[in-house]
């Protein structure tokens, strides 16, 4: 019975050792892959840094201010365009009214002239 127990314990220990070796190998592979990926990502990050230089905060702030200035100028131009479009519409309306008044005046004169000729 003791021999069976000892054999069983030895078998269990061998299983544990095999399992531990398997886990150690798997962990080592995972750590190696992770390390390689990390290294690749660091290299890629450095390439990106060189390729796309990040502007400092002062320069970014200057760009934002310039953008806002241009937006304000654009808004001012749009309001001027709106004003001139309305003015043009009013002038066209005024011109139409003047044409109507001129025709009415012409009709009055022609009637007046025809009345004075009689």
Swiss-Prot record:
State the family it belongs to. Belongs to the BLI1 family.
Please provide, in alphabetical order, the Gene Ontology terms of the cellular component aspect for this entry: endosome
Tell me which Pfam families the record gives.
BLI1 (PF17324)
Q: How does it assemble?
A: Component of the biogenesis of lysosome-related organelles complex-1 (BLOC-1).
Outline what the protein does.
Component of the biogenesis of lysosome-related organelles complex-1 (BLOC-1) involved in endosomal cargo sorting.
Q: Which InterPro entries match?
A: BLI1 (IPR020491)
Which UniProt key words apply to this protein? Coiled coil, Endosome, Transport
Q: Which residues form a coiled coil?
A: 55-104
Q: Which pairs are disulfide-linked?
A: none
Protein name, as recorded: Biogenesis of lysosome-related organelles complex 1 subunit BLI1
Query: Where is it localised?
Result: Endosome
Record the organism: Zygosaccharomyces rouxii (strain ATCC 2623 / CBS 732 / NBRC 1130 / NCYC 568 / NRRL Y-229)
